Amino acid sequence: MEVNQLGFIATALFVLVPSVFLIILYVQTESQQKSS
């Protein structure tokens, strides 16, 4: 099976970007709860 490099990069970005965004939101809410 030949993997299309551009398709692989697009899939990786499609998965990684929302994951990083959710992690950042989670860390921000966690730090706010601890400080208050």
Curated annotation (Swiss-Prot):
Its main location: membrane. NCBIfam families: PS_II_psbM. Residues 1-11 are lumenal. PSII binds multiple chlorophylls, carotenoids and specific lipids. It comes from Thermostichus vulcanus. The modification Blocked amino end (Met) is found at M1. One of its GO terms (biological process) is photosynthesis, light reaction. The keyword Transmembrane helix applies. Belongs to the PsbM family. Keywords: Membrane, Photosynthesis, Photosystem II, Reaction center, Thylakoid, Transmembrane, Transmembrane helix. It comes from the Bacteria. It holds the Pfam family PsbM. This is Photosystem II reaction center protein M. The lineage of its organism: Bacteria, Bacillati, Cyanobacteriota, Cyanophyceae, Thermostichales. The chain crosses the membrane at residues 12-27.
